[in-house]
Amino acid sequence: MAKPCGVRLSGEARKQVDVFRQNLFQEADDFLCTFLPRKIISLSQLLQEDSLNVADLSSLRAPLDIPIPDPPPKDDEMETDKQEKKEVPKCGYLPGNEKLLALLALVKPEVWTLKEKCILVITWIQHLIPKIEDGNDFGVAIQEKVLERVNAVKTKVEAFQTTISKYFSERGDAVAKASKDTHVMDYRALVHERDEAAYGALRAMVLDLRAFYAELYHIISSNLEKIVNPKGEEKPSMY
């Protein structure tokens, strides 16, 4: 019976892997000790900005440069008195909501950053999982629980990206309907409703981002010993 062979790496390849691991562990250390506390504070400051504390949502409305057609002639007009039916004037360039776009420019990078940090933490913990063998696996179970939670946060953050894309799609549809059926005022109102709903969603995103960072800080720092030293070795090390 053939013996299973181990992974054979050249000396140079092994060096490159070791450098990657060292950089990974250093990034994880910086993330936990420096980045996380600062990010929680910076998001708290962002939530105090005027742009995220708009009380009158009607002030968020962007002007819709969509011509309103003249009302139809009265039914009792004589056919000879009626003018030829005029074609509805076409719309020109319709920009997006500048206030929402400015807010999106602040929030989108924060969403991307948290997603990348989740990937960093996941990769870091995966590299700390010891060789599977009989013995005390309590620490490994904790690693798996933390990984499960970080993956859940990553999934929620990815849903934020979908929400942002959906805003443009739904608002675009509403604007298209308003420009096509210019006599239907409800379509114009729908555009404003989309903007107001998006504003509320963006503020909620920032609140959630801050909460996720706080959760990551708590769950990692509370279980750090078992994460970096799952087998209870004498000399635990993040590196």
UniProtKB/Swiss-Prot annotation:
Region: Disordered, residue numbers: 65-87
Induction info: By interferon gamma.
GO biological process, one term: antigen processing and presentation of exogenous antigen
Pfam family, one: PA28_N
Subunit and partners: Heterodimer of PSME1 and PSME2, which forms a hexameric ring.
Its job: Implicated in immunoproteasome assembly and required for efficient antigen processing. The PA28 activator complex enhances the generation of class I binding peptides by altering the cleavage pattern of the proteasome.
Name listed for the protein in its UniProt record: Proteasome activator complex subunit 2
